[in-house]
Every structure is written in structure tokens, then in C-alpha cells.
């Protein structure tokens, strides 16, 4: 199974494992979403798959306003950025590069939050992925446009912000719609011969 569909994969697992009851049998069905130029490395073939009917905001069903097709590594990094930023109730920004967060900040003002997250490690943030859990404003878009990043992710974008981003033709802009913090999620690991599955609680009881 391609881990490119990891987030929606977890949601389907959740439907099978309601109330934390681990069933005896688990059947998963996916539909091909798109072919990719290559996988994690140039010599590897790859494709992305989605769960039919899944409507929860995720990278696979995001509205892509502009930019070229997402690569395998783009999807993995974007999914990681989204998973991190959606954990916060406060206004938050997460910067991810090569599957690792290199800047995270929370606060009241989205521009201040972006600047602190980016400046936490501005060298690593160069060419990275930026995710917000609030609507991206024109003011924030103006700041992002001054640096090189691969992808910007947010629940929504002001019309003026999208106009700013249009000047950066290679930038991917992903709109997910409103998403909420989850109390728990399913963790799946792909190992030879099977998949270990467990619940991870995101809030304290």
C-alpha cells in the first residue's frame, strides 16, 4: 500500500474500528487518484490512491488553486504538515522540510505566527511546506511571496491572497476547507507481512 494515502487510509481504518474495537477482519478499498512522475526516489514508480466517498479535509482531496502536480514527497510532507497544524486550537503555522517540522508557532495574529514559525529555522524552511489552521490573509501571502516555498496549505484563502500567489507560478496552493482538531486518530504502520494498528489519543481524558 502506498503511504501517499496515509491520512485517508487512517480514516477508513477508523470506520472499521469504531469504539476502539479491533475487528477480526479488515478490508480496504482504494481508487487510483493520479500517476506520479516517480516515487520517493527517481528510479521508483508511484501513484496515489483515495478512499471513495471520503470527505474529511485532507491532502488528497484538497483544492489545488495553482502550480504543478504534487509529487510523492510533496504529498508525504504536506500530510505531515497538516497533521501537525491541525493539533492546535490556537492560530498556528507549521513549516515542514523533508518530512520534519523545522518551525512551529501559535498565537493570536496569523502574520506573527507565520513569521515566528518560518524564522525558527529559516535556512531549513527554504523550499519547504507551510501549513496554517486559519484562513491565509493577503498580508501573510505578501510575506510568503518574498521567499521560496513549495506549498502553502490552509483551510481557506482570501481572494487577495490568491492574487498575490498567482505571481509565483510554481507555488502549489492547497485549500482544504474547515477542519477541526481530532480527539483521537488511528496509527497504522506498514511492515512486511501486515499492518500494526493502534489508537492514539490527542487529548487528555
Regions found by a protein language model. Give the residues of each.
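Single conserved hydrophobic/aromatic residue that forms the stacking wall/gate
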Residues: 1-5, 9, 201-204
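ATP-dependent carboxylate/acyl-activation modules
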Residues: 10-202
Amino acid at each position: 500500500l502506498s503511504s501517499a494515502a496515509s491520512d485517508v487510509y487512517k480514516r477508513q481504518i477508523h470506520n472499521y474500528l469504531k469504539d476502539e474495537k479491533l475487528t477480526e477482519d479488515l478490508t480496504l478499498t482504494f481508487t487510483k487518484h493520479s500517476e506520479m512522475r516517480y516515487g520517493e526516489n527517481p528510479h521508483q514508480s508511484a501513484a496515489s490512491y483515495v478512499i471513495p466517498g471520503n470527505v474529511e479535509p485532507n491532502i488528497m482531496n484538497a483544492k489545488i488553486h495553482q502550480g504543478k502536480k504534487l509529487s510523492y514527497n510533496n504529498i508525504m510532507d504536506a500530510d505531515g504538515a497538516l497533521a501537525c497544524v491541525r493539533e492546535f486550537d490556537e492560530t498556528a503555522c507549521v513549516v515542514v522540510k523533508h518530512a520534519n517540522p523545522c518551525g512551529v508557532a501559535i498565537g493570536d495574529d496569523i502574520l506573527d505566527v507565520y513569521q515566528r514559525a518560518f524564522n525558527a529555522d529559516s535556512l531549513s524552511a527554504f523550499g519547504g511546506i507551510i501549513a496554517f489552521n486559519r484562513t491565509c490573509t493577503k498580508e501573510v501571502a505578501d510575506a510568503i511571496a518574498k521567499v521560496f516555498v513549495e506549498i502553502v496549505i490552509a483551510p481557506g484563502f482570501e481572494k487577495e491572497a490568491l492574487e498575490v500567489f498567482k505571481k509565483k507560478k510554481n507555488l502549489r496552493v492547497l485549500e482544504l476547507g474547515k477542519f477541526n482538531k481530532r480527539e483521537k486518530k488511528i496509527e497504522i504502520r506498514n511492515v512486511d507481512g501486515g499492518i500494526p494498528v493502534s489508537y492514539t489519543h490527542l487529548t487528555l481524558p
